[in-house]
Amino acid sequence: VDRKTQEEREMSMNRGFFRIVSTGHYTPEMILSNKDLEQMVDTSDAWITERTGIRERHIANGKTTSDLAVIAAQRAIDRIGYDKEKIDLIIVATFTPEMKIPGVASRVQAKLGLDKPGILAFDINAACTGFIYALNIAERMLSNDTYRSALVIGAEVISKVTDYRDRNTCILFGDGAGAVILEKDETKEVIFHVSSKGDTELILCAEDHISMDGQKVYQFASKAMAASIREVMSYGDISRSSIRKIIPHQANIRIIQSASKALDIPLDAFYINIQKYGNTSAASIPIALDEMLEEETPASDEKVLLVGFGAGLTSGACALSF
C-alpha cells in the first residue's frame, strides 16, 4: 500500500468509546404487501421476493417522521427505565423530515419534554448511511466530556416521496424508526469507517419522488459493504470468530449475499429483516439492531458490526462492543 493510500485509509477510520445502554424501534401498523403492489403496478410477489428479498413494508399513513422517531425513542427509554433528563444530545438521521425547519430532532426534543439548558438537537442527512454517520458524530461529541448521554435516531417516512406508479422503486421502500441511547464508556471501544464519493446522480430525491440507477447502485453497494467491513476488521484487529453479528443496511438481499460471498463470511452471520420492512433508509440499521438485541445478547468479548451505504455515494461501518 503506497503512503498516500495508507494516509487516505487512516483518515477514513477512527476509534472511540461508548456504550449502547438501550435500543428501541417502531414501524407503523399499516402494511403494504407484495400482493398489494400487484394491484398497483405491473409486478408480482415472486418477482419482488426473488430480486429483493422483500415481502412487505410498513407505511406511515399520516404519521410524521417525528411521530415515528418519538415512539422509537420512548421505547428505548422505557425498556430500561432510563432517566430521560440525562439526555443532552439528540441526533436524528433522516432524508424525509416532515418540514424544512424546525428539524425532526427539535420536534423529538419537544415531544419528549426535554427543555433543560444546554441540550443540543439537530438532524443529519447522509441517506441510508445516516445512522452510522450520526453514531460517529455522537461519539466525537461524547468524547470531549461536554455531553454525557446521546439519543441517536434513524427515522424515515419514505412513502411520501415514493412514486407508486414506478415499479422499479415503489417495491423497495418502507417507513420506520430506530433509536439508541449512548453513554461514554472507556471500556467499550468502537471502530468507525466512513466515506463519501461525492456522487450526485445515482440516487436522487430532487423533487417529489425518489429515483435511482438500480444496477449501478447495486455494483457500488456490493463493493462498498464488503470494503467497509474489511476496513473496520483490519483497523480494529477484529477476527471473524469474534463477530457475533453483522447488521447491514437492508436494501436488497442480493447486495447482502454478494458481500457475504466477497468476505467469505456465512450469510447466517448477517442479521436480515428486509423481508418484513423493505428499505427504510437511515432507520434500517437501528431497527435491525434493536430486533437482533431482542433475540440474542452478545458477550463482552464479541463484536457487532454495523454497515451501510447510500446516496452520495456514502458508506460506513462500525464495530460495537457490548
Tell me what each language-model feature is:
Residues 41-47, 100-114, 151-158, 255-266:
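Acidic-glycine-rich active-site phosphate/pyrophosphate-binding loop
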Residues 79, 83-114:
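Anion-binding (especially nucleotide phosphate/pyrophosphate-binding) glycine-rich loop
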Residues 143-174:
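Flexible, glycine-rich active-site loops centered on histidine and acidic residues
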